[in-house]
């Protein structure tokens, strides 16, 4: 199996804001450069880990979009983006989102009762975004088959499982130590 994701994480820049150390990576930030081979590696690994007998893939804007696009093209499964702005479409479901660094609303459109879905996102840290997505999908009557985040940083997996009952799959678990990304698993 390719390890492009892990190798690229080991060398990504770290930026300190206050007391928090942010890792800056193409998958989580879209900078400095998203290379096709990295996106291909990630999307191929995702496809092997998720239930593909589904109707739709769901992500929240913004950095889940390149990943779901690549997975959608490879699998012919359409995707839905939970947006940060309201569209006022019939059936739109608003849900409050709180992460470690922001609060706001997300809006779900394009999901019908009984739709089989996979949730896919770039990073899980606090779990706030995934809890919001899961809550919106439950309100819509969707059948959530899998939840997967590319990068796990923090305790978000436990938070999501405690609050929703869903286990979150990840490709890689990291932490930032002494200004560098450490791969944990």
From Swiss-Prot:
Superkingdom of origin organism: Archaea
InterPro entries: HGPRTase-like, PRibTrfase_dom, PRTase-like, Pur/Pyrimidine_PRTase
Keywords from the named record: Cytoplasm, Glycosyltransferase, Purine salvage, Transferase
Single Gene Ontology BP annotation: purine ribonucleoside salvage
Key word Cytoplasm present: yes
Catalytic reaction equation(s): IMP + diphosphate = hypoxanthine + 5-phospho-alpha-D-ribose 1-diphosphate; GMP + diphosphate = guanine + 5-phospho-alpha-D-ribose 1-diphosphate
Disulfide bond positions: none
Biological pathway: Purine metabolism; IMP biosynthesis via salvage pathway; IMP from hypoxanthine: step 1/1
Top class in the EC scheme: transferase
GO molecular function ontology, one term from the record: guanine phosphoribosyltransferase activity
Main location, first listed in the record: cytoplasm
Localization in the cell: Cytoplasm
GO terms for cellular component: cytoplasm
Enzyme Commission number, as recorded: 2.4.2.8
Family: Belongs to the purine/pyrimidine phosphoribosyltransferase family. Archaeal HPRT subfamily.
Function: Catalyzes a salvage reaction resulting in the formation of IMP that is energically less costly than de novo synthesis.
Cross-referenced PANTHER family: HYPOXANTHINE/GUANINE PHOSPHORIBOSYLTRANSFERASE (PTHR43864), XANTHINE PHOSPHORIBOSYLTRANSFERASE (PTHR43864:SF1)
Subunit structure: Homodimer.
Protein name: Hypoxanthine/guanine phosphoribosyltransferase
């Amino acid at each position: 199996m390719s390890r492009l994701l892990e190798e690229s994480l080991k060398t990504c820049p770290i930026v300190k804001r206050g007391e928090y150390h942010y890792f800056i990576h193409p998958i989580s930030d879209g900078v400095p450069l998203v290379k096709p081979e990295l996106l291909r590696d990630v999307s191929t690994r995702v496809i092997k880990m998720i239930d593909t007998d589904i109707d739709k893939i769901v992500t929240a804007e913004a950095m889940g979009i390149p990943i779901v696009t690549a997975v959608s093209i490879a699998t012919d499964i359409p995707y839905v983006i939970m947006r940060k702005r309201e569209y006022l479409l019939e059936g739109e479901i608003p849900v409050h989102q709180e992460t470690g660094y922001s609060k706001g609303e997300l809006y779900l459109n394009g999901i019908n009762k009984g739709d089989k879905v996979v949730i896919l996102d770039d990073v899980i840290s606090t779990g706030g975004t995934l809890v919001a997505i899961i809550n919106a999908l439950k309100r819509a009557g969707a059948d959530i088959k899998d939840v997967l985040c590319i990068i796990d940083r923090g305790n978000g997996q436990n938070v999501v499982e405690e609050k929703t009952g869903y286990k979150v799959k990840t490709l890689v678990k990291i932490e930032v130590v002494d200004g560098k990304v450490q791969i944990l698993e």
